């Protein structure tokens, strides 16, 4: 099916508003086409969703609801996405386009828009992005049932963005200049990086290497699946039973580890020995994305979420041998008010070293006097 310029055409539309069966004829010569423009509120990197990644990848999905002049707030409880449902917007030929062209109503009807990204082509089951959309016949603002993707060592995670701003509600032929301006916001929480450093200068003969990392989510703190509501831009538990991460999540294979030979030590690891500049455990182009805890509030208490880190302290013996001290599951409590919606977090972990210190008393213990010994020298 040909993708037309984000201004589309459909001569006959089914309108579900005050009358679910109302039919409105639209003439392409008198109705202006609806155009689109896109902006992501927070410019981000790598696997994050940005305007650039929207253009290059799957694009985004649009919901549009037509109401009478009374507007969205008055009629949303009885209105379905009758104007557009999961309409796929893509970037082609230097402009945004979509397949089923729509025109602005010429009367006082109003159009309210919602959008999300990345696009899910199977919205009833969420096969592609783990995004399941509310149905085409569902009344009121749409919802997304979202499941955190943990496949491919956490590297398949997606950065869900949405637009539910009031600026794209109750649009009319008179008030709109032809183009709908979508402004997406990040609705997950991002772990941008975890960085590690020692608290002292290790010198030249000691190194620290991080070998593993786990997230301890508690039992009822961190959703692995939840419902996002466009109506109030919040997350809530799925029904009837909330779904949480309830066991430790091993993030070790997500880390940006390498293998080098250091005095015979050659584990896959990350050298975090610099005490002046904390070393990142993640690649520059990757981050972790989770459903936020308590929306914009984050965790209630310090330690509601914890990290567990594994590392080796390696001391040189010769150029080809070493002494290694292995520390496993060193627990770090994350602060309160973390994992907030729309916020990216970087955690800097400082390893406290117990250096062996040497002191010398200025006044040595006195000599013990011994008695004179008579020694005979034989001729």
Swiss-Prot record:
Keyword Metal-binding included in the entry's annotation: no
Oligomeric and partner information: May be part of the fimbrial tip.
InterPro entries, sorted: Mfa-like_1, Mfa-like_1_N
Lipid-modified sites (S-diacylglycerol cysteine): 18
CDD domains: BF2867_like_N
Major localization class: other
Family of the protein in this entry: Belongs to the bacteroidetes fimbrillin superfamily. Mfa-like family.
Annotated localization: Fimbrium; Cell outer membrane
Keywords linked to the UniProt accession: Cell outer membrane, Fimbrium, Lipoprotein, Membrane, Palmitate, Signal
Pfam families: Mfa_like_1 (PF13149)
Protein name listed in UniProt: Fimbrium subunit Fim1C
Its biological purpose: Probably a component of the fimbrium tip. Fimbriae are filamentous appendages on the cell surface that mediate cell adhesion and biofilm formation.
One term under GO cellular component: pilus
Organism lineage string: Bacteria, Pseudomonadati, Bacteroidota, Bacteroidia, Bacteroidales
Propeptide residue interval(s): 18-45
Signal peptide coordinates: 1-17
Lipidation (N-palmitoyl cysteine): 18
């Amino acid at each position: 099916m040909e993708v037309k310029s984000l201004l589309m055409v459909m001569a006959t539309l089914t309108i579900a508003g005050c009358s679910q069966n109302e039919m409105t004829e639209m003439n392409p010569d008198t109705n202006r086409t609806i155009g689109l423009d896109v902006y992501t509120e927070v410019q981000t990197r790598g696997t994050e969703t940005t305007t650039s990644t929207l253009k290059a990848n799957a694009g985004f999905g649009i919901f549009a609801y037509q109401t009478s002049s009374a507007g969205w707030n008055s009629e949303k409880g009885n209105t379905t996405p009758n104007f557009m449902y999961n309409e796929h917007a893509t970037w082609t030929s230097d402009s945004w386009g979509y397949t089923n062209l729509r025109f602005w109503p010429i009367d006082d009807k109003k159009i309210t828009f919602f959008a999300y990204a990345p696009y899910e082509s199977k919205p009833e089951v969420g096969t592609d992005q783990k995004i399941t959309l509310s149905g085409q016949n569902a009344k009121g603002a749409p919802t997304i049932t979202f499941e955190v993707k943990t496949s491919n060592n956490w590297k398949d995670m997606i950065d869900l963005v949405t637009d539910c701003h009031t600026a794209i509600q109750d649009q009319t032929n008179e008030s709109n200049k032809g183009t709908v301006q979508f402004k997406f916001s990040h609705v997950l929480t991002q772990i941008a990086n975890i960085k590690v450093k020692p608290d002292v200068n290790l010198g030249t003969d000691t190194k620290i290497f991080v070998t593993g990392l786990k997230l301890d989510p508690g039992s009822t703190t961190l959703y692995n699946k939840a419902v996002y509501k466009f109506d109030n831009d919040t997350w809530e538990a799925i029904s009837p039973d909330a779904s949480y991460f309830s066991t430790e999540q091993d993030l070790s294979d997500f880390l940006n580890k390498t293998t080098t030979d250091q005095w015979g030590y050659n584990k896959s690891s990350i050298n975090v020995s610099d005490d002046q500049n904390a070393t990142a455990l993640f690649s520059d182009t990757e981050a972790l994305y989770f459903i936020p805890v308590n929306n914009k509030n984050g965790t209630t208490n310090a330690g509601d979420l914890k990290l567990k880190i594994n590392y080796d302290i390696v001391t040189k013996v010769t150029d080809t041998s070493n002494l290694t001290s292995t520390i496993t599951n060193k627990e770090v409590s994350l602060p309160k008010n973390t994992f907030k919606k729309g916020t990216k977090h970087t955690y800097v972990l400082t390893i406290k070293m117990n250096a062996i210190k040497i002191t010398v008393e200025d006044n040595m213990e006195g000599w013990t006097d011994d008695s004179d010994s008579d020694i005979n020298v034989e001729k």
